[in-house]
Structure formats: C-alpha cells, structure tokens
C-alpha cells in the first residue's frame, strides 16, 4: 500500500540516497496532521452505523426509484437494502483506512482500482454513492483539523466517482 511517506522512502532507496530536506519536511507535515487524522478515524468509526444508516436513507430520498425497482441492484427488498448499506459502509471504511495510513493508498488499492468495471457490471450508479458520501460529509460531526482531514478523503472518493 502506497502512502506519501512510503513513496518518498522507496524513491530515495531506489536512488541510493538519503531523504531530501523536502521529503523530510513532507514527512514532518504528515506527522503533524496525524493526530487530527486519527481523531477523524475514531470519530467516523464511532458513528459508522448511524452515518451509514442515514446516508443510505439520503440515497433513498434523493433516488426513490432505488427502493421501487425490482432486481438485485436495487433496494426494493431487505436484501437489496442490506447490500446498499454494505457498499456505503465500505466507502466509509476505506476513508478511515486512508486517515490512518496518511494517504489515498488504501482507497486506490482496494476501491478505486476496478470501480468503473464493478459499477458497470452490477449496474450501480455512482451518483448513489456520491449522494451518500456528501451526506456523510455534512453529518459526520467532526470539526477543525479532524474535519479537514476526513473531508479531504471524502472528496477524493467523490472525485473518483464523478
């Protein structure tokens, strides 16, 4: 899994050199933000069930057809609703992993790679997940640096979907 820190170390090592001042300063900046990132990860994790539940409801409100259409890709059944919640929870989990890792590596490796193919294959609309993520962003209850850190990864996920 790549993070800005592991990439800097790998680049320096492959070139047989020590980290440059710029790379060390970047690492220092990351460590300064680490406390806020961990606070955000803890906050999102503590509220994960309620955030996923309310984000799922936000999707159903904005896209009511998702609960009216029959089929395995919609939420007309309890099984479909469970799948929707599971998928939204997966996005939120990836965001918390990124917060802990200090970079987009977890999301890049485990979510974004193949995202278009999955959505096409299962006829899933990215707009559903964008709505869910926007709802989470507006309702996570974080503030200050923790909110800034969380929102940066939420925005990254939203941009990957659009």
Curated annotation (Swiss-Prot):
Keywords: Antenna complex, Bile pigment, Chromophore, Electron transport, Membrane, Photosynthesis, Phycobilisome, Thylakoid, Transport. InterPro entries: Globin-like_sf (IPR009050), Phycobilisome_asu/bsu (IPR012128), Phycobilisome_asu/bsu_sf (IPR038719), Phycocyanin_a (IPR006246). The keyword Repeat does not apply. (2R,3E)-phycoerythrobilin binds at residue 84. It holds the Pfam family Phycobilisome. It is found in: Cellular thylakoid membrane. Contains one covalently linked bilin chromophore. Signal peptide: none annotated. GO terms for biological process: photosynthesis. It comes from the Bacteria. It is a peripheral membrane protein. GO terms for cellular component: phycobilisome; plasma membrane-derived thylakoid membrane. Its main location: membrane. Light-harvesting photosynthetic bile pigment-protein from the phycobiliprotein complex. Belongs to the phycobiliprotein family. This is R-phycocyanin-2 subunit alpha. It comes from Synechococcus sp. (strain WH8020). The gene is rpcA.
